[in-house]
């Protein structure tokens, strides 16, 4: 378990506070997890963002009438801190019985509080239900590798040694899998996700990639660090000209987390998948 996470509200019974309480937010430094991967804030080999989508945002108008909305949060991948997910939920719940004059006031409040917790500016977008109703669900780019036949014997740790490639072939492709699963490092609850790999480099063996993704199945780590580990393992193997790893996780407690790491300029459509 991440040492700071032991002191977070995750996995503990909590009082649900219904009036605005920004102190509920619990930041966790990224530094310890970066160190496990041999990284520091100054040596990150990627740029990126963590997209959080909130489906349970509500507050009151001055008249006392409730408003409901959906919010998108963009936390920079190089921010000093992540925000522990249960504390994020508790904080958002604290808006439920709080009056705001305008949606802009809600947005400004969220931007200020989340940026303070993350240690870097956090983007906030608040959308009405009617804005989203016609969007439907997205499909992931490239080839789905989930139907490949593989033999799996171990699930307790990520196994980069399973990965292999053909260095004689340099290709550019996108592949994806819906079989990503890891466990919360605090509660051991399952985290279900889909992952996209886009790259230009030595041709990656698809069966080996699928076996590697499945090897995360009993691994305990936060969503963000799982994606960073995948990125680094593929970067070491492929030595690619460009590489993007992007995961979309199933929501829990009204929030889903979608980490994006890339050697390239951010270019992603934050649209939900069928399981989200």
UniProtKB/Swiss-Prot annotation:
InterPro entries: GTP-CH-I_C/QueF, NADPH_dep_7-cyano-7-deazaG_red, QueF, QueF_N, QueF_type2
The UniProt record lists the keyword Oxidoreductase: yes
A Gene Ontology molecular function term of the record: preQ1 synthase activity
Binding sites annotated in the UniProt record for NADPH: 85-86, 252-253
UniProt keyword Cytoplasm, yes or no: yes
Residues that, per the record, bind substrate: 83-85, 223-224
Family assignment from sequence similarity: Belongs to the GTP cyclohydrolase I family. QueF type 2 subfamily.
General function of this protein: Catalyzes the NADPH-dependent reduction of 7-cyano-7-deazaguanine (preQ0) to 7-aminomethyl-7-deazaguanine (preQ1).
Name of the protein in its database record: NADPH-dependent 7-cyano-7-deazaguanine reductase
């Amino acid at each position: 378990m991440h040492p700071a996470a032991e002191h977070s509200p995750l996995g503990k019974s909590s009082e649900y506070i219904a009036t605005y309480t920004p102190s509920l937010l619990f930041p966790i430094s990224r530094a310890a997890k970066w160190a496990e991967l041999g990284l520091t804030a100054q040596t990150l080999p990627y740029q990126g963002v963590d997209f959080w989508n909130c489906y349970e945002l509500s507050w009151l108008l001055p008249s006392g009438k409730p408003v409901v909305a959906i919010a998108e949060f963009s936390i920079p991948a190089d921010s000093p801190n992540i925000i522990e997910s249960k504390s994020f939920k508790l904080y958002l719940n604290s808006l439920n019985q709080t009056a705001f004059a305008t949606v802009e006031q809600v947005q400004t409040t969220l931007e200020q509080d989340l940026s303070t917790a993350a240690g870097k500016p956090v983007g906030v977008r608040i959308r009405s239900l009617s804005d989203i109703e016609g969007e439907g669900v997205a499909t992931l780019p490239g080839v789905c590798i989930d139907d490949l036949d593989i033999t799996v014997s171990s699930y307790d740790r990520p196994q980069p040694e399973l990965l292999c490639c053909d260095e004689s072939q340099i290709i550019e492709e996108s592949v994806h899998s819906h079989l990503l699963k890891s466990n919360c490092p605090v509660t051991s609850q399952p985290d279900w996700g889909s992952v996209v790999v886009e790259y230009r480099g030595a041709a990656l063996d698809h069966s080996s990639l699928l076996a590697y993704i499945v090897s995360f199945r009993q691994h305990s780590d936060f969503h963000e660090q799982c994606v960073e580990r995948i990125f680094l393992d593929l970067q070491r193997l492929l030595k690619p000209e460009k590489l993007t790893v992007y995961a979309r996780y199933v929501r829990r407690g009204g929030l889903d987390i979608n980490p994006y790491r890339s050697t390239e300029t951010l270019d992603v459509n934050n649209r939900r998948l069928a399981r989200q």
